[in-house]
Amino acid sequence: MDILLLVKAAIMGIVEGLTEFLPISSTGHLILTASLLNFTGEIVKVFDIAIQTGAMFAVIWEYRVRLRATVAGITHEAVAQRFVRNLLIAFVPAVISGLALGGLIKEHLFHPVPVATAFVVGGLIILWVERRHRALFGDRDLEGGRVARVETIDDMSALDALKVGLVQCAALIPGTSRSGATIIGAMLFGFSRKAATEFSFFLGIPTLMGAGAYSLIKQRDLLSWGDLPVFAVGVVFAFLSALVCIRWLIRYVSTHDFTVFAWYRIAFGGLVLLSAWGGWVDWKD
């Protein structure tokens, strides 16, 4: 087994875990990182999605108490039933749009320049939503007071879930960010930052699980048992880095907004576009 390949897999796993739940696009960062590392070949077509299962398991582990209670109460507790219903409703639009448009989008947009453009556009949208949120609530949302219509995920209606599910479809465009679309979209629909962030975490479980399973089944002919160590390293590092990120982000959103991520997206995306335009970096597709 090529040690350098394992190191690249570890780096990719760390990038996935640190970016999956931040509004900065894990797919975009993986595409750019793979380009810089020259991490290419048939295996990459499956690897990027497969290692997302590591991030998914981090959510399951961090919220294992809530998830265990939900499973135990699914047959007789209204709160558990509503929670599962909302997750399923929010998940369905991504399934439909992914099956209908996924191949076309992957063919035309999974390249560094479109990703960088989406980074910049997404950053501008976050700035606008944060400005709107602050105009409505001031700093009260950062001070622990109840200000939003949906203060916790238990306050959600089926319509709320559907709207969040629809905005998640925008994340099919690489560089948009699944967590960014769901968190910022939820805030636009009246969620508190914490409720938006937590629902985005939970929605990632069926979304990442479904995407990973579909990719592995569809691309199974590209895989061999010899690839297992590479995938295992990527998944483990994605799990560990995602766990750190989840715990940090929940604390962060209690007292901070998402403006810093918007400026990061704009600066990073702008730098990639500038380097591509100037020919400073050979961004490999």
Swiss-Prot record:
**What membrane topology term does the record carry?**
Multi-pass membrane protein
Name where it mostly resides. Answer: membrane
Q: What class of enzyme is it?
A: hydrolase
Catalytic activities: di-trans,octa-cis-undecaprenyl diphosphate + H2O = di-trans,octa-cis-undecaprenyl phosphate + phosphate + H(+)
Question: Alphabetically, which GO biological process terms does the record hold?
Answer: cell wall organization; peptidoglycan biosynthetic process; regulation of cell shape; response to antibiotic
Task: Cite the entry's keywords alphabetically.
Answer: Antibiotic resistance, Cell inner membrane, Cell membrane, Cell shape, Cell wall biogenesis/degradation, Hydrolase, Membrane, Peptidoglycan synthesis, Transmembrane, Transmembrane helix
Superkingdom of source: Bacteria
Q: What is its EC number?
A: 3.6.1.27
Cross-referenced InterPro entries: UppP
The Gene Ontology CC terms held by the record are: plasma membrane
Provide the function of this protein. Catalyzes the dephosphorylation of undecaprenyl diphosphate (UPP). Confers resistance to bacitracin.
Q: Fetch the HAMAP family from UniProt.
A: Undec_diphosphatase (MF_01006)
- Record's protein name: Undecaprenyl-diphosphatase
